């Protein structure tokens, strides 16, 4: 779910951003609202912090509605984005969970801990970092350090 606007560094990368590996059904008002605002913020943060690790995806459930007549494509109820600034001093991370619905809040209001995204997805982010650093990065939600320059 890498935005095409972030893949302009090569023709191949841009083309690959439109493949099924990078696509997931999103409601229009999410994709043009809070989610789009978050993607724009991530671009700003990348300029500020030089390097970001961004992990984005759907939060899957056992039962999900589908779209399509011949090929049934599952429609997730939520999406997540985890952002890690490894070279910021101190390094920092933030996560977001947004419903696949009309998101009527500011993107900052969807901030959650990385631990919460791990609980919802079953993923273990930053597992190669020392345990103390992992706990520091994953346990809290410090939206102010991200949204205020």
Residue ranges and their predicted role:
Residues 1-149:
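Domain-level detector of nuclease and nuclease-like folds
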């Amino acid at each position: 779910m890498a935005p095409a606007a972030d893949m302009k560094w090569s023709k191949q990368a841009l083309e690959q951003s439109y493949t099924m590996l990078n696509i997931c059904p999103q409601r229009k008002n999410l994709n043009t609202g809070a989610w789009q605002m978050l993607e724009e913020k991530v671009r700003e943060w990348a300029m500020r912090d030089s390097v970001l690790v961004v992990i984005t995806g759907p939060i899957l459930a056992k039962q999900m509605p589908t779209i399509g007549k011949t090929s049934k494509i599952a429609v997730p109820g939520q999406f997540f984005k985890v952002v890690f600034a490894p070279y910021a001093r101190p390094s920092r991370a933030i996560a977001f969970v947004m419903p696949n619905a009309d998101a009527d809040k500011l993107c900052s209001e969807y901030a959650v801990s990385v631990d919460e995204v791990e609980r919802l997805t079953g993923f273990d982010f930053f597992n190669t970092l020392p345990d103390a650093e992992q706990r520091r990065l994953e346990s809290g939600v410090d939206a102010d350090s991200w949204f205020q320059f």
